[in-house]
From Swiss-Prot:
GO terms for cellular component: cytosol. It comes from the Bacteria. The keyword Ubl conjugation does not apply. It is found in: Cytoplasm. The lineage of its organism: Bacteria, Pseudomonadati, Pseudomonadota, Gammaproteobacteria, Enterobacterales. S-adenosyl-L-methionine binds at residues 196, 216, 225. GO terms for molecular function: RNA binding; rRNA (guanosine-2'-O-)-methyltransferase activity. This is 23S rRNA (guanosine-2'-O-)-methyltransferase RlmB. It catalyses: guanosine(2251) in 23S rRNA + S-adenosyl-L-methionine = 2'-O-methylguanosine(2251) in 23S rRNA + S-adenosyl-L-homocysteine + H(+). InterPro entries: 23S_rRNA_MeTrfase_RlmB, Alpha/beta_knot_MTases, Ribosomal_eL30-like_sf, rRNA_MeTrfase_TrmH, SpoU_MeTrfase, SpoU_subst-bd, tRNA_m1G_MTases_N. SMART domains: SpoU_sub_bind. Homodimer. Belongs to the class IV-like SAM-binding methyltransferase superfamily. RNA methyltransferase TrmH family. RlmB subfamily. Pfam families: SpoU_methylase (PF00588), SpoU_sub_bind (PF08032).
């Protein structure tokens, strides 16, 4: 099986991490972009086939998204499932996890992955039936983070949360109405942060399985933040508390 990725950062990240996955790369005919040149040089050094293509063809492969003049056909990456989680946790002294409940917009998922990678999150957990798929759009927005951070798809999020609690991982969920704020919460131990869908928040069962609910204090007239922005705020407060 193969898949398409596009964008300079996404291609560069995979090239650095797993060049064996590349099947062929297509670049825009006549494109003279200094950012592309080192990527092309490394592709050639790895012996990866490079072909020139028209903008119309590249646009079609990227489904009219912004591809920055480069599209790659690659072997499908590893898909993480819930049965991968126990072994992963066994190897973590201080787990730092992100749970996304109902983030179905690919741009939001990609931005959340980028935040998670920057914050040093060990894995992102998503419900199989209520999450955007790890498609080319997600990988483009994630700027390489989709290739470096495990995204674990689970069939039963509540069951997975119970597993985490059995491992003494403290689960903190975000809810706008929560009295306890992010900055009053202790985020220094084994931690799973739960972010809900924008506008809807966490589902009832997800909320009930949280050990603690927190809110982000808002000073202006808006009542909430974009889910990827809120995720970044919460993750990096945890990083600050954890001495990062």
């Amino acid at each position: 099986m193969s898949e398409i990725i596009y964008g300079i950062h996404a291609v560069k990240a995979l090239l650095e991490r797993d060049p064996q996955r590349f099947l062929e790369v297509f670049i825009l005919k006549g494109r003279d972009d200094r950012r592309l040149q080192p990527v092309i040089a490394e592709l050639e050094a790895q012996g990866i086939v490079i072909q020139v293509a028209s903008r119309q063809w590249l646009d079609k492969q990227a489904e009219d998204a912004v591809h920055q003049g480069i599209v790659a056909k690659v072997k499908e990456g590893r898909k993480y499932q819930e049965n991968d989680l126990p072994a992963m946790l066994d190897n973590l002294e201080m787990p730092f996890l992100l749970i996304l409940d109902g983030v179905t917009d690919p741009h939001n998922l990609g931005a959340c992955l980028r935040n998670a990678d920057g914050a040093g999150v060990h894995a992102v957990i998503v419900p199989r039936d209520r999450s955007a798929q790890l498609n080319a759009t997600v990988k483009k927005v994630a700027c390489g983070a989709a290739e470096t951070i495990p995204v674990i798809s689970v069939t039963n999020l509540a069951r997975t949360m119970r597993l985490l609690q059995e491992r003494n991982i403290w689960i903190v969920g975000t809810a706008g109405e929560a009295d306890h704020t992010l900055y009053q919460s202790k985020l220094t131990g084994p931690l799973a942060l739960v972010m809900g869908a924008e506008g809807e928040g966490m589902r009832r069962l997800t909320r009930e399985h949280c050990d603690e609910l927190i809110s982000i204090p808002m000073a202006g007239s808006v009542s909430s933040l974009n889910v990827s922005v809120a995720t970044g705020v919460c993750l990096f407060e945890a990083v600050r508390q954890r001495g990062g």
